Swiss-Prot record:
Residues 353-438 form the KH-like domain. It comes from the Bacteria. The gene is der. Keywords: GTP-binding, Nucleotide-binding, Repeat, Ribosome biogenesis. It comes from Prochlorococcus marinus (strain MIT 9215). GTPase that plays an essential role in the late steps of ribosome biogenesis. This is GTPase Der. Belongs to the TRAFAC class TrmE-Era-EngA-EngB-Septin-like GTPase superfamily. EngA (Der) GTPase family. GTP 1 binds at residues 10-17, 57-61, 120-123. GTP 2 binds at residues 183-190, 230-234, 295-298. Associates with the 50S ribosomal subunit. Residues 4-169, 177-352 form the EngA-type G domain.
Length: 457
């Protein structure tokens, strides 16, 4: 479903993100008592009175200051208003009307977007009415007192909001594919997001840490809707101070956890760092599908063999993700960026894939014929009775054996490699569970499930 959009607009530190969290009943927007925490525009879904919509949180809008990221934030706010069905101007009731509020109100009056004024920080109902009355001078209609922290007045505000929203007239019942863009600071994640979307959705800067939140973007490619999450860069813990970056990194880790597929971005010039390896380990631990994107490939001097040498070197350090597809791109020029969706979709499909027990056992039987299970010094040999896939996301197989201790790491890796060679599963981790089974219990299960035993005692 393509939802109507509400753009949250206002000066820095008037409580926009707190109000977003209140209206969406979530904590996804980073809230910190410091101006400029929100920089890019971020999206969350919400519903009220049986009507669904999405809210876009924007950075603090300042017209008369071009320092730091303020010009880029202005661009993000302008883009948010262009796509919005409704603007919600948030002001600070305790501070009263400021020159900044008047400038924003003038800009909104000149736009074609309907605007509702929310007077925040009105903790008392009686006092709130008095505080809100001053904001009639903005010329945007009746001001509405609310408290984002305590929730008072937000129900009435939402009633007004849904009354102004258009009907949802575009529907798509297909499931959205969640794809997170993961990487160290300044490897080009936001540039990649902008290249993918064909517009400036995230602020791009040479300064590390430009993205402090996780940015959700919904786009359609082919027959699929993709929800793309650009995350904050993840640095060493000792370099992370408590505050916006701390919260942003937590959001980034949560983005991995809720993703169908992760795009791990590596800097082609810098190569793989310790932090890249930790991110790779995190993706593997969470069992997520993944593709490795080597960005800034346009900056590398190369000949006909460079790509093979670089891939070999990178894979030797990203051994956690030996099963991931690796592609070399330039987010700046757009080189091979479109290939990301093809490989990401394949990884998602493999991550969700199921294989019948008969096919699994055909592969195991052939694998054993090429290389028998090891024999211990005591003369006891491992026996692999049969295997079956027990779940997907990621694909998980249970292999029933006489004694798991008889199967060392080398043979276990051999079996996983054979499963991949014969069945694919590129782009997704595999989990193999080795389970010991007594002969009596095995016979009952084999008879009940009509399974052919690969090896007998």
């Amino acid at each position: 479903m393509i939802l109507p959009t509400i753009a949250i607009i206002g000066r820095p530190n008037v409580g926009k993100s707190t109000l977003v969290n209140r209206l969406c009943q979530s904590n996804d927007a980073i809230v910190f008592d410091k101006p400029g925490v929100t920089r890019d525009r971020t999206y969350q879904n919400a519903s009220w009175g049986g009507k669904e919509f999405q809210i876009v949180d924007t950075g603090g809008l300042v017209f008369d200051d071009d320092s730091e990221f303020l010009p880029e934030i202005r661009t993000q706010v302008f883009l948010a208003l262009e796509e919005a069905s409704l603007a919600l101007l948030v002001v600070d009731g305790n501070q009263g009307v400021t020159d900044g509020d008047l400038s924003i109100a003038k800009w909104l009056r000149n736009s074609s977007c309907k605007t509702i004024v929310a007077v925040n920080k009105c903790e008392s109902t009686t006092l709130g009415i008095s505080l809100a009355s001053e904001f009639w001078k903005l010329g945007l209609g009746e001001p509405n007192p609310v408290s984002a922290i305590h929730g008072s007045g937000t129900g009435d505000l939402l009633d007004l909001v849904i009354g102004e929203l258009p009907e949802n007239n575009i529907r798509d019942d297909e499931e959205k594919i969640m794809m997170s863009i993961i990487g160290r600071p300044n490897v080009g994640k936001s540039s990649l997001l902008n290249s993918i979307c064909g517009e400036k959705r995230a602020i791009v800067s040479d300064i590390s840490g430009t993205t402090t939140d996780s940015i959700d973007t919904l786009i359609k490619k082919g027959d699929n809707y993709w929800k793309i999450i650009d995350t904050a860069g993840i640095r060493r813990k000792k370099n992370v101070k408590y505050g916006t970056e701390f919260f942003g990194i937590n959001r980034a880790f949560k983005s991995i956890d809720r993703s169908d597929v992760c795009v791990l971005v590596i800097d082609a010039v810098d190569g793989v760092t310790d932090q890249d390896q930790k991110l790779a380990g995190r993706i593997e631990e969470q069992g997520r599908a993944c593709i490795i994107v080597v960005n800034k490939w346009d900056l590398v001097e190369k000949n006909s063999s460079t790509i093979y040498q670089v891939e070999k070197e990178l894979r030797s350090k990203l051994y956690f993700l030996h099963w991931s597809k690796m592609i070399f791109i330039s987010a700046l020029t757009g080189q091979r960026v479109d290939n990301i969706f093809e490989h990401a979709l394949n990884a998602v499909n493999q991550h969700r894939r199921r294989v019948t027990t008969s096919v699994v056992n055909e592969v195991l039987k052939e694998s054993i014929s090429w290389k028998s299970p090891p024999t211990k010094r005591s003369g006891k040999q491992g026996r692999l009775y049969y295997g079956t896939q027990v779940k997907n996301k990621p694909p998980t197989f249970t292999l029933f054996v006489n004694d798991p201790k008889l199967f060392g790491i080398t043979y276990r890796r051999y079996i996983e490699k054979q499963i991949r060679l014969n069945l694919g599963f590129e782009g997704t981790p595999l989990i193999l569970l080795w389970r010991g089974k007594q002969q009596r219990a095995l016979n009952k299960e084999v008879e009940r499930e009509n399974i052919e035993v690969i090896q007998k005692d």
